[in-house]
Amino acid sequence: MAELGNILLTLARNAIASRLGQPTQPVGDSPELHAPGATFVTLTQHGQLRGCIGSLEAWRPLGQDVRENALAAAFRDPRFDALGEEELPFTRVEVSLLTPAEAMNFTDEADALAQLRPGIDGVIFSVGNRRSTFLPQVWEQLPTPALFMAHLKQKAGL
């Protein structure tokens, strides 16, 4: 899995570098790249979010998914201006490979909070037409289930 992680990271970095006219690095191949996969690509600068775009479901080949999400995070995240060439050396790229979403069964909010596994679970929160998503790394900033869910609900506008 570490080898696949390095390949995905190189694909993401290469997609951004190529769009900016910068040199790219050699990248290996893996059968997993040709199977459907879902990724999120997160860009940070000095610990601050700079872009994050991804796919919640696997609907295209994994290699294509990571490249497209890297480009979208760098150049089309509506929260930020497009990444500039001068920013690239200071931009950290992270690729999250998602597993298929699983529905949670719970009786109330306390039951839902008790089922969450800090540092492991990402959550897709949906109520009516409101929806928000947190990846597992968000637990680093919101370490308790109560904080995690409160911010997730706020992000959904609830």
Predicted regions and their residues:
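Basic nucleic-acid-binding interfaces
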Residues: M1-L158
